[in-house]
């Protein structure tokens, strides 16, 4: 892999025995591993040096050749090649099997590929492979047909002979009986003796008859079996088979075990089978057609690739390199070994025993048993536990087979290929660094020295502080004083990456410029805590070092924290002042009536500050100050004759002036109180309208001012700040009476229990709200708790209510509301009973959180997997389509106001068409980016909706185009080509997943609409939608427009639609207790919901088409997030929904290469149809398919990505059989094979850039004489300066690629 793009495809296939022998460096013949005395590998064993290479660098086994100068020589004594020991990680061996075995993946996987190919049930296949039944592998039908009359004659003769023999035997017994009776008669024997003789003869006759009849029946059975014998017939009766073989062995062949399968595969005619299956599909129905379709897929896979089906039966087993299944010595002289060695050992032992038995010519039954054991040994090596009981090691632990090495979180894919450990990294606890700038972090000196060690050592040598690298290393390890100076010099301008786990979105890793600090803790800027979701209660963070100049440049330009002010999920700032900073700025900007210096007028800000220092002026007093660089705000009344740029006398407070000084000079004056909302608006505005540098500087100013004034505000919290409202007992008494009345009605039987509960809950909710209001009214504006909550610095009114007012209603462990409230507040203290019932909710909260975190992480993983190949690939796909999105709605007065969801729908999109007003004037041209400014202009012009480009309507073949995606929310500019928008979408949806509630919400036992049904909300609902599952209690939607009638019976209701177009009536049976949304006789339109309940997205797709299904899914997902107050932009959900609907199920294949029932990518389906139509043939027909994200991930074109996601063995089995090629378009597959990902700067369009010097540069290179003939050498030798100057080449890029 010399260059980044050395190959563009990765294909997987079935390995034949020749391939396996080709990879191998020798055959492993013995089960030994290493000699326990010498600890050297045994010859021909599992660790043999002759096969796998030397265990020491440049040294053969016997020691004849040592040192690198003998490189490449093969020792004539021990046969080991002199080379590096690391070849033991690459070289494979093989085991030559004495009998073929089948590959367990292909016969035991679901579905069984071998079974489909040979048209055998898995049960029958198992019988053959494990020597429980014989399989007929070939029948010579022609000679059988020719010989049948003669054979029939022979058979009849033999049968007649048998009948004659039976009859003569019986006649002989009868004669003997007569003689015996005559003899007894002569002797005058008793009647009893005669009876005895008769009985004995009867018994003999019966036995003869029975034996002969059985033989005749067996003869008939064998004959019938032979006449109808055909290939692939199974015979489980060994006796019958033997007789068949003895009598008619000339006309057929049969065997058992993998040999039978192998013979069968050798003679299998794929082409004929495919033809016959196509015929069945064309003319068949039901089960036969379905099975034929499934079989055709398998047969086609072998026909269209150069895979040989014989690869499913192995004659040789590969042995993986010994370093991948190591054996290490433990302290006590014992050895720990990989499970694979045990599994290989069993295979070799059984194989050797089988060879010996075959050489000895052992009886068939013994040989077969040994072959079966070999088959089982190879099975457990490949996939232990797939069939029968797994092979266990000590302590009954199942051994890890080759399949287990690939599967799961600890498998090869996820552990080593997708998640690698990183050198040049460290981790430590974080503490706050309020003195830092936004782009800085504090790095502990010792950690920095360790991270930058190689750089420091090189620099020490360059500066002649050390003679060589070795002494430089010694200096670093002894912390010499020069080392710190060099370190200081090296870390300037060298960014480091900080990461806090869990990294839920891209802001979890950001770049900072390190500042050396004492101590051992990393210092973090307070404003980036929000992005990392970090706090300073013991959180740890990891530091990584970008090494190459390219990596440093990317870290600085793309990842520096001051360039990551916006959140990728909604484009709003994430670096907002919080907590202390808010309280400081709030303290600065509030107005206080009647405080010192109120009403005074100051000629300048300095004068006002002087008065403040002299204690003549309060920070919050309303005064007038003359401001030199005043930028008026909307609604400021300018005095007559005032021009912008002139000084102005402004009525404000000193605090307000100080606050405004933190903002950019040309920023309009802010007169509002700086609470959380106002600060958010300011930062938002800065991010939208100012360069990043200005925004970052302003944020730092706000942070500094916030901390400074928070300290001076003296905000503290004491128990005396918590005031219980005096009116509380009176309020409670009033509601107690109401509750008693309800209880009385229940006792008299006027209402039932559910109604009682509902009424009580309503009463106590009202009481709680009233007490909360009384509490808020009683708090003074200067109360510190009031200021904290009002400013948005910390806490909310609900928490304050519980401390100072009333705890209120709580839920029991089932999630139902207990109808008696906790009447105390925490300030007053809870009674024992109150405390007890309050603990339920607390415990449930903790349990829920733990569950939520795991579920949310898994959801993110599935989302990333389904969308990881969505990358912006082109500028414009050229589509004319788009989505119509509302931007304004009329309010109660009929005036237009911004739609509440415009932030997450129309904002940051590209307009699809020109927006024109009623007069036809173009207000915004198509292709314009729809930012806050544009939206405000359109609103002012009275526009209510616009048509915008969307990912859902994008026509790019792979990925999406920049215009359909619109603005990148993280940067605020149009998205760059190469941006991995799929992963950003997955992170944006998954990151707030933890905040979503876990539980399916129970309406407190209330008999509300739908009879107290569970409403699936929160995370489970999101999963249900993205997995495209049919929800519980699904509501039908009208399939046709028409009139509806309601028919009721004892058990259920039927809703019957009589369509307008006169087609057949459609009936929907529903439960009697369903809440109807329509009335009898009402007219319904297509897609209208008929009863209350969730709708099945698959029905929406079937009835209303893909466009409606997409809109439905986006709206539903957004509904869940919005209900929790989480803002995510629609475009992220659209990216995922587009991936769910990108496949088509083929219904009729026409003349195309597609198979009926096949799931084809939409692009491939359309291309294939275009090709077929252009050739004048019939195209394929298909219907769009809605796939859940897990299923869509597994159905991806990339087998590497699918295998590393889930069901690894199934994916690899299928991919190998189909000989799949991975086009390496997504990110995952490139990470796995160690290539740069094809996103961002890894795209070919960025990596394959050549630099051409400009004309001026070329000219400046060749200043001086134009030709050598005119050249004067005096210029060099004389004392005059030369006429031209040389340019050092290494300072100049000539544009040639010398690499």
UniProtKB/Swiss-Prot annotation:
Binding site for Zn(2+) 1: 60, 62, 75, 78
Cofactor(s), names only, from the UniProt record: Mg(2+); Zn(2+)
Metal-binding keyword on record: yes
Enzyme Commission number(s) of this protein: 2.7.7.6
GO biological process annotation, one example: DNA-templated transcription
One Pfam family linked to the record: RNA_pol_Rpb1_2
Positions that bind Zn(2+) 2: 877, 954, 961, 964
Residues the entry annotates as binding Mg(2+): 535, 537, 539
Disulphide bonds in the chain: none
Gene Ontology MF: a single term: zinc ion binding
Annotated GO CC locations: DNA-directed RNA polymerase complex
Free-text comment on the cofactor: Binds 1 Mg(2+) ion per subunit.
Reaction(s) catalysed (UniProt annotation): RNA(n) + a ribonucleoside 5'-triphosphate = RNA(n+1) + diphosphate
InterPro entries assigned to the protein according to its UniProt record, in alphabetical order: DNA-dir_RpoC_beta_prime (IPR045867), DNA-dir_RpoC_beta_prime_bact (IPR012754), RNA_pol_asu (IPR000722), RNA_pol_N (IPR006592), RNA_pol_Rpb1_1 (IPR007080), RNA_pol_Rpb1_3 (IPR007066), RNA_pol_Rpb1_3_sf (IPR042102), RNA_pol_Rpb1_4 (IPR007083)
Superkingdom of the source species: Bacteria
Record key words, sorted: DNA-directed RNA polymerase, Magnesium, Metal-binding, Nucleotidyltransferase, Transcription, Transferase, Zinc
UniProt keyword Flavoprotein present: no
Gene3D superfamilies recorded: 1.10.132.30, 1.10.150.390, 1.10.1790.20, 1.10.40.90, 2.40.40.20, 2.40.50.100, RNA polymerase II, clamp domain (4.10.860.120), RNA polymerase Rpb1, domain 3 (1.10.274.100)
Similarity section: Belongs to the RNA polymerase beta' chain family.
Function: DNA-dependent RNA polymerase catalyzes the transcription of DNA into RNA using the four ribonucleoside triphosphates as substrates.
Quaternary state and interactors: The RNAP catalytic core consists of 2 alpha, 1 beta, 1 beta' and 1 omega subunit. When a sigma factor is associated with the core the holoenzyme is formed, which can initiate transcription.
Protein name: DNA-directed RNA polymerase subunit beta'
Lineage, top ranks: Bacteria, Bacillati, Actinomycetota, Actinomycetes, Micrococcales
